[in-house]
Amino acid sequence: TVSLWRIDMFKNVITFIFTLLIGGSLFAQDFQKYDISATKIEKKAYEKYIGKSDKTDYRYEKDTIIDVDEKIDGNIIVIEGDLTVKGQVDGDILVILGKVKIENSAVINGNVTSVDGRIYQEEKSLINGNQIETKIKNLFPREEWDDDFEEDFERSRFGRNLDRYEDNYSTLPLGKQDNSILVRYNRVQGLFLGVAAPKSISGKYNKFTIHGFLGYGFQEKRWNYEVGLDRWFFDQRDYRFELGASAYDFTDTRDNWMITPTENSLAAFFLHKDFQDFYRRYGYEFHACQNLSIFLQGKIGYRNDSYEILNKNTNWSLFRGGRNFSENPIIEEGNMRSIYGEIYYDTRNNKKNPSRGWYAKLSGETSNSGLNSDFSFNQYILELRTYQKTGRYERIDTRLKIGTGEGDLPVQKGFELGGISTLRGFGFKQFRSDIDTLAIFHSGYDRMLLGNIEYNIDPKIFSTGIPLIDEIQYIFFFDFGNVWNSFDVTNKNEFYNGFSHLKWNDIKSDFGIAFSSRDGNVRINIAKRLDTAEKPFTITYRLSKPF
């Protein structure tokens, strides 16, 4: 009875969290992104793009269709909805936060304006006026912009927003992705050079996408590659269904969520410090994924992977020549056949440096003898993030990450915490499973709890007039969490067991301050752990946000 009650409680908690995430954002209108009221935005747009008109105004607040047999003598204003025109409009069209689709049968005797949207015109349609695509920020003087507008504007000036699509299909890889040239350096591969063909959602009529990479590690003396083929069905974006397959053989790491490959390569090349751990993974996978909206996507797949231990192959670094790289940790070798699934919800305005939006991801993986696998485990990970403005120049970013498992998690699947991006007052991966843990429990650490809170203050809140000071963003942060093995606290191995014992004394925590560039691409963290007064402050330098 107790076990059933705990299962029901766990399910209810998960349901509540996702209801809160999805429901909360659905009730939040797009206008709430801006510090300028919806009424003021509409008034400014009307004055600028319609102005004084003798025609009647027809105003709508939802998706609207002008059918082929309709003739509208007047101006059409659509707020937070899409407009499809098949008939005739004798007047101006203004759509705010929506798309305009003008079909072949349409005739428009006036201007067509889309504010924070797009205009799609079919070849045989007729528009006797101007077509204008613009942004809300263009309606107001610069000093009235939301701070997010200024960040986006500055980034776009230097081409740093090329990976963002106008409609922010955040669950789909649109536009320019990562660089096509790969350059890395680490203690296993030494110098790695390669080329990549990043995945994109492809064009309307090009339903197949080929993606992957090819490169060579000069110290490991081995080629690395991945080649994938995807085919989408039904709807290209909003309700896209996709089938795909890939084959690969490469030096892999699971540490990219802690530190980016670029940061790690720079640290290894210049500072003789390699933070990432590596292993060889080769095999193939099949997957199917379904977009339930432009922000919500589910995915299920099958993997057949072989894992091999990799040794350290170089000790060279440009500086600190007297040091040695640490040895690359061992893993459990073998063939892992698994079924995995994930569902995630993503409304972030920018994946690399988000300043608003939500992110939620629930993932699971199972591997067992029924799949002819050398491993037997189930693993589940839930991650929630929010980026919430609390004022014109203030924002709170939060992350909660929970991991659990059943069976015997191999070392390469065990949970690890400490240092960069996790518990910043502690050593990097200070809390991790190792061969001694494996010998005792026959499993890596199978429980994890991590929380991060950051309070961001924009320098404009002070307005000192000093150029350097006014470009520094101040971030106060608090981290808490730990990893452990369920057999330390209970003789039950179900995924929902092993958490009820937790007290605050079981949680590691730290606090600190960070100084960051306004775009968030450079930051210095100064953190102090809270479990002792003797340990010094920990200082880290980053070229990316921790989450």
Predicted regions and their residues:
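Outer-membrane beta-barrel "beta-signal"
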Residues: 340-343, 513, 517-519, 535-547
